[in-house]
Amino acid sequence: MTSPPGTRGRPPASPPDLFTFPGRRHARWHAGVLLAVLLGGLYLARRHWPALESGAGRLAGADPGWLLVGATAALGTWAASALAQQGAVLRRLPGSRLVAAQFAASAANHLLPAGLGAGAVNLRFLMRCGLPAGRSAGALAVKATAGAMVRLALIALLAPACPGLLRPPHPTPTTLAVALGALVLLAALPATPRWARCRRALTAVLADIRALHTCPARAVALWGGCLAFAALHSLVVIAVAQAVELPLPPLQVALLYLAASSAAALLPTPGGLGSLDAALALALTVSGAPGAAAASTVLGYRLLTVWLPLLPGLLVLGVLVRRKAL
C-alpha cells in the first residue's frame, strides 16, 4: 500500500499529550485563584509580620534534636507514599524508581494547585510502567480515597482523646446556602449527560478496590502506606512543636494538623501552600498556643516538608524525565 501524497517520509502523528491544559479559560481561572491566594498570603504576612519574625527567630533557637526527628519523619513520608502507591496496583512496580517518583511528585505538587502536579507525575510514571491510562488514573483515585478515609479515621480516633478541641462552627446563612446549593447540585447530577461517564469511572474504581483486596499484601501496603504517610506528617508537626516548646500536648497537635490539612485539601492551592499554613496556625492559636510559637511551628513544618526538599525534588524530576521514566 502506498502512502498518500505529501505524507511520504513523514513520521506518524503522535497522540495528544495527556498533560496538556484543559483550556485557556481553565488556565486563567487557576492562575486567578493562585494569584488571589498569593496576594492574600502576602497581606496576612504583612499584617502579622511581627509574629512571623518572632516565630522565625524562635525556630532558629529550637532544639536541634527534635528538628532532626522531624527531618527523619519527613524523609519517611516519601517511602510511605511509595508503599501506598504500590498497594494501589496489582502489578509490581520498580522500587527505587517508585520512591524517586514520589519524591519528584511532592516537588511538582507545590507548583500546581489541587494536587495536579503530583497526579500528573504519578500518572505518567504508572503508564511508563505499562499500566493503561484508565488503570493508572484508577490507581491514583484508589490511593486518594484510601488516604482520605485513613485521615478521617485518625481524626475520629483522636477526637475522643482531646475532648472539646474540635468544635463545629456555628452555621451562618451563607454556609447554609452553600450547603443547600451543593446538595441540589448532587441531586441533579444523575440527570446530567456526564452521569453515565461518572458512573462508569466510579464502577471501575470500586472494581479496582475489590481486586486489590483479594491480594492481602497489596491491601496491607495500601492502607499501611496511607496510615504511615498521615502519621509521619503528624510526627513532623509534633517534632517541630516540641522543638519550639509549643505548650500543647502531642495528641492535640496531631489532631489539629489532621483537621487543618483535611480542610486545606478543599482549597486549590499548590501543595496546600497558604491554605494549610493559615488553617494550621489558626487552629494552634485558637487552641491556646502563642502566636509566635504557632508561626514557628508552621514555618518549621514547611521548611522540612517543602522548602528544603523542593530543589532536590525538581532535580530528581528532571532526571526521571531525561531517563524516560516519566
Give residue ranges: language-model regions.
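Hydrophobic alpha-helical membrane segments of integral membrane proteins
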Residues: R124-F125, L140, L152-A153
